[in-house]
Amino acid sequence: MEPRSEPEPQEQTILEYLKQQLSFRKGEREVPSSGSTGGQAAEPSQPFPWLSAGALVLAFLAQLLLEPSTNRSGILSIILYIFALGLLLAGGRRKEWSLDLAHPSPQGWRIFTDTTWLILPGIGFATLSFFMLSHGFFTLPAAFVWTAGVVLVILGLWEHDTEAQVESEPLKPSFLTQFQQDRIWVISAGLVILIVFYFAISRLDLVPPELISGQVDHFYTVQEILHGKTGLMFNRNLVSEPLQYYWAAFVATLAGGKVSFTLLKTAYALAGLVGTFYIYRLTKELIDRWAGLIAASLFGVAFWPILQTRAVLGAGLTLPILIPAVYYLLRGLRRDGENDILISALLGGLGVLTNKVFLIFPLVVLVVLLIWLYHSKENSKVSVFFSIIALFLLVGAVTAVPILRAFTLNPQEYLRPILSRVSSLETPLPGNPLGLFFNNLLAALGLVNWSNRSSWVDGIPLRPAVDWLTGALFILGLVIVILQYRRNI
């Protein structure tokens, strides 16, 4: 008589995964049944996380009430948020949820390699390109020398001893094998990819009834690049940094060399998919792949990220560069990965070529490094801390040589957008500077959930900067991170 085949284990659905993450107690995991001849053992049922679910519902309702309306009032939303946070805290006490971050095994730092000497010729090439760009325009020889300098510096710091960093991994199965083994994951990932791609490219052909001057300048700048005007900065634009215009010109060249408003949105929509992919990788690095898939799906259909790719006002490449830079920074610190830190520094330098908002990125890196050093239990990490700072400064400066040269040629024009907002350069300050600072700080704290303080071009006036779903999850997620941090210190 042939032996009876055991029943195949049931695959986990996304709904079951969410319920499991919310209901499992910290440290508990599901114990698979032994599959004895008597059938599968009964699995212990987990109580539904009613308190956490109630917090989610109240937070969604609170944020919905902050949508633009004639009688919008924040009082009721604040009350609902207070109740939501109370339920969230109660759910945490009942162990309905816990933020269990993944903890990879660090391999040990090795900042300097056998090819470190390449840094010297790399700095030499970067310095030479600085003087070759003295006319304020990119030329083919100058671009080649600058690129060579960046490549040599990266190669000089790149860790080639992969055996010391990467454990041997088994060969990845073919797509068919992976589909047979984990079809729920493959189907879910494919569905998310299709939905995100649809939201990214849907209705790109629509044009606003009236273009503003910033959008028109953006259009003509890309057109000028295609006709040979390869400037280091484009001062007439809302954002003068050049990288986004060159990206749009590159896409236009691939499309036949004709510029249109639809083509500009398409170029930045394609770049936006990179940001969505790295949202998945970042969340997967911190938690797991299912959480990463959920995060990518929410980010890919969210109002604010899509708006950045369609407004054509200078932020089209900001998120596609910023998110990978943060990912590689955190991954490098968690895994002692020098190469990840290098990539983050490279992206930070490219970010300075993209938008002035990246001028704050060095401060973000410093804060992250200080927190990492504070929680480190090894005295040797102090030397690593200063080595990473030096690495960021070197790679970032070499990568940002074109914008540094543009700054030295015309510092007033580069600083004008910044100084006009923090001083009386263009108009007198309407009040006490300290009072204005705190008023602006309070307004900035309310951008996500109360009012974006923007025009119709880059948002819906008097509406929160993000959609109601993102706004509610932002508040709950922020509280969860703070609570989990307090538990871990």
Positions of the model-derived regions?
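Membrane-interface transmembrane helices that cradle and orient dolichyl/undecaprenyl
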Residues: 109-110, 155-159, 325-343, 351
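Hydrophobic core segments of transmembrane alpha-helices in multi-pass, intramembrane catalytic enzymes
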Residues: 146, 272-275, 299, 314-326, ...
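Short helix- or helix-capping micro-motifs
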Residues: 196, 295-300, 348, 352
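Transmembrane-lumen/periplasm boundary regions of multi-pass, lipid-linked membrane glycan transferases
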Residues: 199, 204-232, 240-242, 246, ...
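Short acidic/glycine- and proline-prone juxtamembrane loop motifs at membrane-interface regions
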Residues: 265-268, 304-317, 356-357
